């Protein structure tokens, strides 16, 4: 059985507006295994940032459940949530400044693997980069190109 670090169940975040109710996040569910990373990608205004903020309770969810490291954090107090956030991270990226134009696609993908000492062997890092590129649909011919 996989070791789940984050489980999000039926997360919703609605906002009242002059025109009615805006369903910014509507019934989002997913799990993340320990040691894995999740990227939420979508067009502007689709609810990516709101989803992240609701998970961290920087915005209170309208409904749903968030379980972090086996603990339901949905009903934690503000003080407990502040402490819990030290173990959680969300990175909001500006697509125009998120890629270093001096690094190849391969170097960019390998950087967190190397920095976090996930793998040390050069061949293993190269294999993981290749695997990750395949996972997200990046052609291998792009491995040594620049953004």
Predicted regions and their residues:
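Conserved ABC transporter NBD signature motif
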Residues: 64-72
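Conserved ABC ATPase "signature" region
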Residues: 72, 123-141
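Short helical segment in ABC ATPase nucleotide-binding domains corresponding to the A-loop/adjacent helical element
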Residues: 96, 102-115, 126, 130, ...
